[in-house]
Amino acid sequence: MSLQFIAGGSGSGKTRYLYEKVIKESEEHPDIQYLFIVPEQYTMQTQKELVRLHPRHGLLNIDVLSFKRLAYRVFEDLGVQLPQVLDDMGKSMVIRKVAGKLKKELKLYGGHLEQPGFINQLKSQISELCQYGVSVEDLAMVEEETDRVLLKDKLGDLKTVYGGFKDYIESHYITAEEILDILCRKLPQWEPLKNSVILLDGYTGFTPVQYRLAELFMIHSREVICCVTADPREMLYKECTMQHLFYMGRHTVCRLRKMAEEHHIPVLKEVWCDNRPAWRFKESPQLDFLEQNLYRYNGKIWKNDPQDIQIFRGKNPAEETEYVCSCINEKVQKEGMRYRDLAVVTGDLASYGKEIAHRFDEAGIPYFLDDKKSILENPFIELIRAALDGVKDASYESIFRYLKTGFVYDETYSREEAQVLTTGWKTMQEPWGSKAGKTGI
């Protein structure tokens, strides 16, 4: 049992060092299992890179897992039967039902349940409460302590919905966030862990339940190695304020070290990856200089012409996007780069996304837009929703929303809409056709 940190700045080669270390040790000790724990979105890339670097181009005693995939591996080996897991859509449906039943008890939220996006926001809030282990009692305690009326009402409503949600799913369902809680209870029983080396990479910090798992790793496995982003010019084991540039990395180190000391687990000397220029920026000293001095406020400046960093000022998003298109075409046509090697990063995807998509389509540039599309924007979904609303009361809005989706187009609907507006017809509470003679529709 031991704990070791691999530290360094961004792009300094921490992950590459870890890959090479694991590959070498896995060949020397084929009887030991190496568990690479990375965020879900990095599992495939990590596997691909390890296979590429491995002399035999295969992984026999190295497993790349996320916390969630590790949970399912453990449950499968131990024969643990899980209740049905609620996904995001399931949670939204349960919250909508529970909140609807408790509507009269909600002081602030009651009037917003029909507002588009409100249930989704409430679902995200409840998911975060589950993820960080906040109970209904914790919310009640904070509600009692605060003197701010608006905050008290919000906490009260959240407590009511959260409590109703918990009661509804009890003994029938579990949320995805609760899977790791079950893993914490079952992990000590998993025999393969005792002969495993755990490697944590790609995390800027951990949630409370992930810290509990890291603690179990330290207690029951052979060794835990964790990569953290930190500045080699600063003290790694000293706590700092939240405003500090490397607060998250140093906080993670201090918390894991404290856990190790509580269980009398030795903390090995850390490995610093601080070669200059950094591995990621070895082709660009300017970017390496920027990584070393950005937000440091030390007064250092780059004295030469920064050819690898350019600033363009456009009048509007269209002009900016047009310039980006020209840069991409130049990189591909003159410098031999491929489209997959290029990325466009924006801080306001809502404003720039449509403009970028439009310009890229015009220029014939293939792209993937990392944006989640709402299903409500689909015209067929709008057709179904309008039809259901129309069955309720046949209101003007629902009927003409239905007609304007394009699936049931009737060239006479414009004339009919004008006639409806003229007669002032808003809704039809009576059965279909009862007013047909009066309105002519």
Q: Where does each model-flagged region fall?
A:
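Polyanion-engaging groove/track-forming segments
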Residues: 1-441
